[in-house]
Amino acid sequence: NGVCMHHDLGCLGAAVNTRAIERHLQILKEMGCNGIRCSHNPPAPELLDLCDRMGFIVMDEAFDMWRKKKTAHDYARYFNEWHERDLNDFILRDRNHPSVFMWSIGNEVLEQWSDAKADTLSLEEANLILNFGHSSEMLAKEGEESVNSLLTKKLVSFVKGLDPTRPVTAGCNEPNSGNHLFRSGVLDVIGYNYHNKDIPNVP
């Protein structure tokens, strides 16, 4: 019985107020909730401390976008330079919390689809960003995995290198077999945010 929980606290805004977070969790518990998805960014440490103490399980989410922007000035501007450092700090900070049962590497990232900008990188850019054992010659071969699938593999591998004990997922909003995150084959749990009626049609 889980919910997606954004980091703001209503009229209090995004500032951390431990008592307000505790009250929020108490209300959720009274509703029968026992699971939290931190959407769509790392939560305040205070939230995880409270979830540890109050008996919630947490899906801890790192990113709301990768390299393809959703708004003009979002994290996509910094992804190439900062994603490894931020993912490293995120996992190391949160991995000792017993409430955390799964990592999420992204929410509805636009790299799910073939028309995402990630598929139009030059070979040099792709190798620079991915650095995942694929030469530019390999990437150029017909039938080679998409850059988006390789990026998914890279992120999951990075997470598993820091914490091999927990499954990794991503929140996806188009359940079809062409989804590059699905096609990577590395997500332990396939996240479907919508289109429940279509789920039986996806292998």
Residue ranges and their predicted role:
Residues R53-G55, F79-P203:
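Active-site neighborhood of glycoside hydrolase catalytic domains
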Residues N1-D115, K141, K153, V168:
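Active-site-adjacent substrate/metal-binding segments within catalytic domains
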